[in-house]
């Protein structure tokens, strides 16, 4: 599956948006990928995650388990794990850091692929990887549907992405004038508290 194939899935779902967005990282961007509109259709999610699973195996080999960060990584993590024929578990934020809960755990030395939806700065990926390593897992790779950094982000392990884009993202104090002139939308989820 090519970058264009992945973007076609986002376009078909109405999930490739243009405007002025505050991402969950806190950065501002003229492009937002509304992944939930993609993942709400099982057939679309299946196509993307099957291709991601194939790329994981071709790149780093077969993992023993897939671990994802809640909430955004749960659906692609589960579907990718299905195609890898491994268990899918996730970590949740507790006290500001990711922890294994709900009876989820790793066996020491298990080969783990960390599966995300979209990576921009890699913060959630690095935090999830740290939780996996703390629990005794061996992280053989991180994987995502879309890498918005164009391959520049460093998560500390190989990053396998189905689609790599170089999408501009800016701190609030360094916005280009054309982006600053557009009203802000804040679709990110990291700051939401239930």
Curated annotation (Swiss-Prot):
Gene3D superfamilies: 3.40.50.2020. The keyword Ribonucleoprotein does not apply. It catalyses: orotidine 5'-phosphate + diphosphate = orotate + 5-phospho-alpha-D-ribose 1-diphosphate. It is an enzyme of class 2 (transferase). Pathway: Pyrimidine metabolism; UMP biosynthesis via de novo pathway; UMP from orotate: step 1/2. Transmembrane segments: none annotated. The keyword Electron transport does not apply. It holds the Pfam family Pribosyltran. Keywords: Glycosyltransferase, Magnesium, Pyrimidine biosynthesis, Transferase. 5-phospho-alpha-D-ribose 1-diphosphate binds at residues 116-124. GO terms for biological process: 'de novo' UMP biosynthetic process; pyrimidine nucleobase biosynthetic process. One of its GO terms (molecular function) is orotate phosphoribosyltransferase activity. Disulfide bonds: none annotated. InterPro entries: OPRT, Orotate_PRibTrfase_bac, PRibTrfase_dom, PRTase-like. PROSITE patterns: PUR_PYR_PR_TRANSFER. Catalyzes the transfer of a ribosyl phosphate group from 5-phosphoribose 1-diphosphate to orotate, leading to the formation of orotidine monophosphate (OMP). Homodimer. Belongs to the purine/pyrimidine phosphoribosyltransferase family. PyrE subfamily. This is Orotate phosphoribosyltransferase. It comes from Caulobacter sp. (strain K31). The lineage of its organism: Bacteria, Pseudomonadati, Pseudomonadota, Alphaproteobacteria, Caulobacterales. The gene is pyrE.
